């Protein structure tokens, strides 16, 4: 997921994407705690993707406020 693709989405789509990423992050952390997670890089990727979505949401909010 890159920022260019995210900028093309609507605010509602971004909020849905953020909710999905938070669920995914929770599931990955739960798997890590129970010892089932094999690819620990997924936690970092989910966290960074959530940060990207939040950044784009803030950019859109700032643009709408102007």
Swiss-Prot record:
SUPFAM superfamilies: Ribosomal protein L29 (L29p) (SSF46561). Signal peptide: none annotated. The keyword Ribonucleoprotein applies. One of its GO terms (molecular function) is structural constituent of ribosome. It comes from the Bacteria. Belongs to the universal ribosomal protein uL29 family. NCBIfam families: L29. This is Large ribosomal subunit protein uL29. It comes from Ruegeria sp. (strain TM1040) (Silicibacter sp.).
């Amino acid at each position: 997921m890159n920022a260019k693709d995210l900028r093309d989405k609507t605010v509602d789509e971004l909020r849905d994407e953020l909710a999905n990423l938070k669920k995914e992050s929770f599931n990955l952390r739960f798997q890590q705690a129970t010892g089932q997670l094999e690819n620990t890089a997924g936690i970092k990727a989910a966290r960074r993707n959530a940060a990207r979505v939040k950044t784009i949401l803030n950019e859109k909010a700032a643009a709408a406020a102007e």
